[in-house]
Each structure stands twice: as structure tokens, then as C-alpha cells.
A protein has these predicted regions:
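Symmetry-related core transmembrane helices of the 12-TM Major Facilitator Superfamily/SLC fold
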Residues: 200-217, 406-424
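Structural signature of the two symmetry-related core transmembrane helices
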Residues: 111-125, 206, 316-331
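Helix-loop junctions on the cytosolic side of multi-pass membrane transporters
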Residues: 160, 217-230, 424-429
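Residue-level signature of mid-helix packing/kink "hotspots" within the transmembrane helices
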Residues: 89-97, 182-183, 295-303, 388-389
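Cytoplasmic helix-loop-helix junction between adjacent transmembrane helices
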Residues: 139-180, 363
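Helix-to-loop junctions at the C-terminal end of transmembrane segments
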Residues: 95-108, 193, 300-313, 399
Length: 429
């Protein structure tokens, strides 16, 4: 007896039920994966770190602005001030290397950030109670060492919080808030000195400093919980950081920092050029006004530079900033005797530092392996500190022995070297 179920021809069209199944299968195979929703980059954690940077900068800019006046009242010379600041910078650089090694552990980096902000605030404010120069040196050195410890931890925390595709904007926001603090700190110092005097003003700087520590605690509470891992001994990893694209990036950063002179030399150059035909006080005020313009330019450009870095690549923004620095050094070398003649050099250097500081952090975060971020930021921060110290020292010698123009020409050469070294740096995919 024949089978009652009809059998379709072998090469005939499939039945409707089979068509549906095949179509569904084809669609399932060809459909692209559903894209993940982008995380908002300006999250509570990013805002918390930005607030910490702003408040901390306000807090330590007050004693920094008033330190020359305090030391003068203690009978200290300008050479002693320079020595204290040089030692403090060296301690900060060493502490940044150590802080980077400790910050590879997510648990340690959180404790370092809170402790670093708190210690900097307390030690800086205690300078207002000193009775001798050596006490200033100890407290300033301790405050800067604590500041050095916290920097790699803060930068690594920000990389934990921000989505990778928005590193540029996140670090740009942090730099903008830091620069706002650099503007607000001296203005607050001027106001407080008129109300309570130099020593009390320095003592009151503890308030914004401790508020910065609270802001970091807030940011940590909004940081994704780190995966548990075995407690590792503290060690600074160097070899992997100096290899490949990360190594090339560090060489480029080192070259830049060897030409990244302290902004006080910009102010000195402007003061000397503006002084002929003017009272010294007027020249100083005009030079400080140009310095404020420098900080405003850096603040305004930081977030847009980060946004461009997210779209076009942080190394492109870094290269642009380095090139602008080279152009500003040419302006400082040529000089001028009016504010209008000097303003372009200050504005160019302000835009340049806004681009460079934003893109340096974002580049390190994007190029460094996740497990080495703390060490990478530590090496980076150490290079910054020691490079700045070397740049200012050599430029100062050339300034005194030959001429200011020679010093700025020397610095411009380092910008060219940094641009060449930056070639070939690639972000991690």
C-alpha cells in the first residue's frame, strides 16, 4: 500500500513551512549584532574627579601664591625659595613613580587617592603656622610628595570610570576643572589676604583641600567594582611600559617634558620686556594678567580638545599641542614691549598646554594595558616631574649665560624632537 503522505519533487519549491524556517535561519545568520548602548561619559564619577581636581587646585594654589611673601617675612632669599620648590618637585616625581606602582592594584589606588588628597590639604595648610624656613621646606616637601602619590591613582581611577571611547572628553574635563582651580586659587588668595592676612589665608586653604578628598570619595562610590584578585607585592613595572607603542609614547612625552619649561619663566620674560618705561609693579600686574589669559585659554580648550581626540585620535591632538608650543616659544624668543605683542605667545602656550595635558592622559589610558595602567601613569608622571625640572634648570642657565632668546630656541628644538618621536604610536584596539 502506497504512503498517503505526498512527497514533493527533489528540485521543487519548498513548502511554506520550510520557507519560513529557511528565511528565519538566513536572517539570523546575516543580522549584525545589536550594538551596545554608549555609556554617558560625563557620569557622576567623572564629575566627582573633576570637582576634586578643581578644589585641590584651589587649595594648593593659595599657599603657593603666598609662599614667597611668607618666606620673605622669615628672611629667606629667592635662592632658598627656588631650592625648596626644586626639592619639592623632585619628591613629587619620586612619589609619582611609587604611586604608579601601588596604583596597579584597584584597592590600593582608591586608598592612595583619598589619602593623597587629604595629606596634601593638611600639610599645605600647616605652612601658615611655621616659625622657621626649615619647617616650610619639610611641610612643602611632604605636601608635594602626597600630591605625587595621588596623581597616578586619580588618573587610573578616571580610566576605570570613563568609557574608553570617551577618554579624551573625560580627561579634558578633568584638566579644565584643574585649570579653573588654578585661576580661582590665586584670586581666593588675594581676597583672603585682604581679610585675614597671609598666615591665616594659608591655614584656611585646608577647607577646599579636604572638600577635594570628599569629592574623590564620592567618585570612588561611583566607580565600577573592580574584579577581586590576589594581593600582589608592590612593584613598578618598567620593561613592558618602554616597549612597543607605549614605549614610543613615553619617549615622545619625555622629549616634550624636557622642553616644557615652568610657566614662571613666561611671566619673568613678560615682566622684563614690559618693564622699560613702566613702574615695576605695573609690569608685574600686566604679566600676571597675561598669565591669567594663559590659564583661561587652557581651560576653554581642554574639553573640545578631548572631544577631537575621541574622534580623530589623542596622538593627533598631542602632536598639535606640541607644535603650538614650538610656535609659542618662537614668540617668546622674539618678544615685544607691549601686551598685544606678547599676548599671542601666552594664548598659544595656553591652548597648547590644554591640548597636551588632555591628550597625554588619554593617550596613556588608551595605549597602556589595563593591568599596567597604574605603573604607566606612574612612569608618565615621573617623566613629567623630572622633565620639567630639567627643562627649567637648563633654560635658566642658558637664559643667564647667553640670552632669553637662546633659552626659548633650545626649548623649541625639544618640541621638534617630540613630534618626530610621536610617529608610530598606536592605540590599543
Amino acid at each position: 500500500m502506497a504512503d498517503p503522505t505526498p512527497t514533493p519533487p527533489a528540485d521543487g519549491p519548498p513548502q511554506p513551512s520550510e520557507q519560513v524556517d529557511l528565511t528565519h535561519s538566513a536572517v539570523a545568520e546575516e543580522s549584525p549584532p545589536v550594538p551596545k548602548l554608549q555609556q554617558p561619559w560625563l557620569s557622576a564619577g567623572v564629575v566627582g574627579i573633576g570637582a576634586a581636581s578643581f578644589l585641590a587646585d584651589v587649595g594648593h594654589e593659595v599657599p603657593t601664591a603666598l609662599l614667597p611673601s611668607l618666606l620673605n617675612s622669615l628672611g629667606a632669599s629667592a635662592a632658598i625659595l627656588g631650592a625648596i620648590e626644586g626639592v619639592a618637585d623632585a619628591l613629587a616625581g619620586t612619589a609619582r613613580l611609587a604611586g604608579g606602582a601601588m596604583s596597579d592594584d584597584p584597592a590600593r589606588r582608591r586608598a592612595l587617592a583619598v589619602g593623597g588628597y587629604s595629606s596634601t590639604a593638611v600639610l599645605s595648610s600647616l605652612i601658615g603656622a611655621v616659625t622657621s624656613v626649615w619647617q616650610v621646606a619639610v611641610l612643602r616637601g611632604g605636601a608635594w610628595a602626597a600630591r605625587g602619590l595621588r596623581v597616578p591613582a586619580r588618573n587610573a581611577l578616571l580610566a576605570d570610570i570613563a568609557p574608553p571611547e570617551a577618554y579624551g572628553r573625560a580627561y579634558g574635563f578633568e584638566r579644565a576643572m584643574d585649570n579653573l582651580g588654578a585661576i580661582g586659587g590665586p584670586l581666593l588668595a588675594i581676597m583672603l589676604v585682604g581679610l585675614v592676612g597671609v598666615r591665616s589665608a594659608i591655614g584656611l586653604s585646608v577647607i577646599p583641600g579636604l572638600l577635594a578628598a570628599l569629592a574623590i570619595v564620592y567618585a570612588i562610590r561611583h566607580t565600577p567594582k573592580a574584579e577581586k584578585r590576589e594581593r600582589q607585592r608592590i612593584r613598578l613595572v618598567i620593561r613592558p611600559i618602554l616597549a612597543g607603542s607605549l614605549g614610543r609614547l613615553m619617549v615622545a612625552i619625555a622629549a616634550f617634558e624636557f622642553g616644557n619649561v615652568a610657566v614662571t619663566l613666561f611671566i619673568l620674560r613678560a615682566t622684563q620686556l614690559l618693564e622699560p618705561g613702566r613702574p615695576h609693579t605695573s609690569a608685574v600686574q600686566l604679566a600676571l594678567g597675561l598669565y591669567v589669559a594663559y590659564n583661561v585659554a587652557a581651560t576653554v580648550v581642554s574639553v573640545p580638545a578631548g572631544r577631537i581626540g575621541d574622534r580623530k585620535g589623542s596622538t593627533l591632538v598631542l602632536a598639535s599641542g606640541i607644535a603650538l608650543f614650538g610656535a609659542s616659544y618662537v614668540g617668546f624668543a622674539i618678544g615685544g614691549t607691549t601686551v598685544l605683542a606678547l599676548a599671542p605667545a601666552f594664548l598659544l602656550s595656553g591652548v597648547a598646554i590644554g591640548c597636551v595635558e588632555t591628550s597625554q592622559n588619554a593617550a596613556v589610558a588608551s595605549v597602556a594595558p589595563t593591568e599596567l595602567r597604574g605603573s604607566a601613569f606612574g612612569v608618565f608622571a615621573g617623566i613629567q616631574s623630572f622633565g620639567n625640572l630639567a627643562a627649567s634648570a637648563v633654560a635658566g642657565i642658558l637664559w643667564t649665560a647667553i640670552s632669553p632668546a637662546t633659552a626659548f630656541a633650545y626649548l623649541a628644538v625639544w618640541m621638534v624632537i617630540a613630534l618626530v618621536a610621536l610617529r608610530g604610536v598606536r592605540s590599543r584596539s
